[in-house]
UniProtKB/Swiss-Prot annotation:
Keywords: Cytoplasm, DNA-binding. Homodimer. Transmembrane segments: none annotated. Belongs to the YbaB/EbfC family. It comes from the Bacteria. This is Nucleoid-associated protein lin2851. Binds to DNA and alters its conformation. May be involved in regulation of gene expression, nucleoid organization and DNA protection. PANTHER family: NUCLEOID-ASSOCIATED PROTEIN YBAB. Residues 1-16 have a biased composition (Low complexity). One of its GO terms (molecular function) is DNA binding. The keyword rRNA-binding does not apply. GO terms for cellular component: bacterial nucleoid; cytosol.
């Protein structure tokens, strides 16, 4: 019977961890991130759900003769914001799996 109490304690601990993980995930999804390129000439904002919420392009980089440069800056700023989301998500969610020897984690 002693093992049953231990099992119940583990189950409660797992349920608590699941709630904490769900809250952390919800907080991450709502968090706003900002990516930039060209020294701030292009800014892309996104939320943790990986949804782009805003793109700001400084008019100084709008050159009809060099659309490719503008495209590169938008792409770089977008990749910057997505990397920030990925890194923050890995760091935050990794706290929950650290120390657990779970396959695939």
């Amino acid at each position: 019977m002693r093992g049953m109490g231990n099992m119940q304690g583990m189950m409660k601990q797992m349920q608590k961890m699941q709630k904490e993980m769900a809250k952390a995930q919800a907080d991450l999804e709502a968090q706003e991130f900002t990516g930039t390129a060209g020294g701030g000439m292009v800014t892309v904002k996104a939320i943790g759900k990986r949804v782009i919420t805003d793109v700001v392009i400084n008019e100084e980089v709008v050159d009809p003769e060099d659309i490719e440069m503008l495209q590169d800056l938008v792409l770089a700023a977008t990749n910057d914001v997505l990397k920030q989301i990925e890194d923050t998500t890995s760091q935050t969610m990794g706290k929950f799996t650290q120390g657990l020897n779970l396959p695939g984690m």
